[in-house]
Amino acid sequence: MEALSTAIGSNLCWVQPKTLERQFELRTEGGLFGSLRFEKALGTLATASSAAGRWTFKRAGFMNPRVTIREAGRDVDLAVYWPKFWGGGWLECADGSRFQWKSMNFWGTSWGFANTREELVFTMKPGAEKSKLSDLLKSQAIVEIGTQSFGLAELPLLLMLGWYLMIMQQDDAATTAAVIS
């Protein structure tokens, strides 16, 4: 995998190579910058990889929901994401840094992380630069990273976690639709 710093000026997209597999790649036309793979078809445990490291994400708690973020192979939380009831939430890192996950539009189709000064780190919106008919049932997103964010040490982790949160949101919406119908 390539370092994100080499992607400055490129169009980054999250793509799903195979429709029925819960595996995703962060790509430009010519390079691979990250991956996210769910361990089970219906579970919430996922492993994310980039040139900066490997992490696991796991949703936990019912009355007090959260997503734990750990370095792969470790049992200590590196960070915890605390969702808010109506969407969005806060990521609290072990070093004290915090980032807000929030909707970028009224419909909640575009999401991104911002720092505590409310400066956007990046945004993700569903779709692909070049959509094909075979992509119709795949989860994909266009990623727009602020140029000031490429030097941010947490950027690779935030990109992986952001996509994990979008996939979890899609799964929750599909489950709700199935229950209601």
Where on the chain are the PLM-derived regions?
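Intrinsically disordered, low-complexity proline/glycine-rich segments
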Residues: 1-181
